[in-house]
Amino acid sequence: CKSIMQSSSNLFPVALISAERRGDLSEDVYRLKPGNSPDGTVELAVTRLGLADVPENRGTPVILLHGSFSNRRFWYSPKGIGLGAYLARRGFDVWIPEMRGHGLSKRNQAYARNRVADYARYDLPAIGAFVREQSAQIPHWIGHSLGGTTLAAALGGQYLGAPAVASVALFGCQVSRNYWPLKIPPVEWGGRFILKRMAEVSGARFKRGPEDEPVGVLIETMRWHGLFGRFGDTERDWWKGLADVDVPLLAVSAAGDHQDPDW
């Protein structure tokens, strides 16, 4: 069904924008408009996967967060391949959000200024609340690359916690790697100056992935790695806040991952 259908939620406006059968899987795509951030134009697309022949027999909810320059297709290809499809076929209730301006999530008005801080403070709590409402269960969260970093920020900033998170799995993400050139203030300042002249960085042009990234995320990352930088925002130190988080955690890294290498 291609037309926009109303979906029931007591949290904020939600529309079911498509409901399709994809082989042995069901694919429902929701558009969330939480209205909880300073930019009221933010809308988030969330894809729900399940077994087509048993639509009412939903299992344990799992939320999959994609990385930078990516979208839902990292987890679930058009041919039904990927971890999202794998988990759905094994009875899990799979939810795949797409970050602002990625995939089916349209660009918000302040797209260029989007930051991990915004995703962590506003978007992930709204997504988590919607999944809990629809599934009546506490979801497990899996994050890859920037998705995992955003999830860690939400936990360290106390925006997500045990009442909303059954467990966390982080794949190929880190914030502790040193980028020594960024410790030299003129280098960091020069990088920021160049980036501020842009709205986004093209994933296709730089062969990073199918999506663009807002320049705000890159400037924020440079600040984390600057001379006096920290993993946090002006209000909270997310790194220190992680010490107070009490949820089951699985962290996976690989020696062959040169961008987010194994310790």
Where are these regions (language model features)?
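Catalytic nucleophile loop
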Residues: 66-67, 87, 96-98, 140-153, ...
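N-terminal cap/lid segment of alpha/beta-hydrolase-fold proteins
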Residues: 11-54
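Short, surface-exposed "cap/lid" segments of acyl-processing enzymes
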Residues: 53-104
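Short beta-strand/loop motif that positions the catalytic acidic residue
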Residues: 245, 251-253
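Alpha/beta-hydrolase-fold enzymes
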Residues: 133, 137, 141-142, 146-233
